[in-house]
């Protein structure tokens, strides 16, 4: 009997009444998933992939030879193809090797890992930092480590999926407050007190990336002080360029030193590679090193990424030129869109969603923009709520005003073509 025919064989099992039931065949099981994907396509929600062959940059070269202006990367500081970082990575490969083949507490800690943790702590003004394979892992390994069934987590309704999943893993009581709504946050803090929570932790994104809205972190910290709660911020879409010196949402909101836990990524503005971190109070970081499962059971950050990241933070401390240019080009782009009648969410962040609402319209709009030479992607359910489809555009420091003019011109042309 072949392996496939064994899969297709109808098996039998007994139910709780002792009756024999037929089990679904393997093909029947797999057809469930096929139908699910077909439904996604029919609803206009299918997320495809468009491979490119060049480094990530303001422009990318596609497999078919086309060169597109990239307007959808998290490459905020334009460092994905930076020669200085590439050279630092090459140098680290020569000095430290390709990988460490171990977790941190066995034999996976090199000196550059400790140096990078110290460098991040110094940049953010925190006590200590712990590195992860990604920020998703940082968030996934946070809540179950520091919260128990006696505690409560109060989470913004628009938090990133990694926070949502991380909260699901812990046994703490869960409260969700309306996006950036301080009145509702206070109500949930009161509910947590009434429930007898021992520790209260407020969890929020620093920037809500689907909308480009910056968190009211001062309001969050004020309420945390009032109700004796800890504050956790995922600053993945902020560190490196938000705030006068790029130190993130806490700097932007004037609450440096008042945030207990900052999680973030090395995979967006900070070079665009991979890796994450949790930075904050020493007592919390110490416990994470002992108990956080993604840290204990995942390989250490690749040496080349650690080495290049050290170089990156040196660059950020030397000059704010990149974030200053990004701020200027973002303001120009936002004004051009508004002046030409596009529906965008007001703000200052370089993540600028162009609202189209209908899922199929957004998908077709993105397709036509690609045909005109602009790489954008339609965002639809479940990434955003149903009926809130959009083209999420993202400015980077390597864009020029001429690039912005071309992008807006293409937006206008596609709008006219689609009526």
Predicted segments, located by residue:
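Active-site C-terminal subdomain of aminotransferase-like
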Residues: 227-230, 237, 242-348
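Short loop-beta-helix segment that forms the pyridoxal 5′-phosphate
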Residues: 103-109, 117-141
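Conserved PLP-anchoring active-site segment centered on the Schiff-base-forming lysine
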Residues: 142-161
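Conserved PLP-binding catalytic core of the aspartate aminotransferase-like
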Residues: 324-331, 338-373, 383, 387-388, ...
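Active-site phosphate-binding strand-loop segment of PLP-dependent enzymes
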Residues: 75, 175, 179-233
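N-terminal "arm"/small-domain region of PLP-dependent enzymes with the aminotransferase-like
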Residues: 35-96, 229
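PLP-dependent enzyme catalytic core of the Aspartate aminotransferase-like
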Residues: 1, 7, 16, 83, ...
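Short, Lys/Arg-enriched N-terminal segments with co-localized hydrophobic residues
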Residues: 12-22
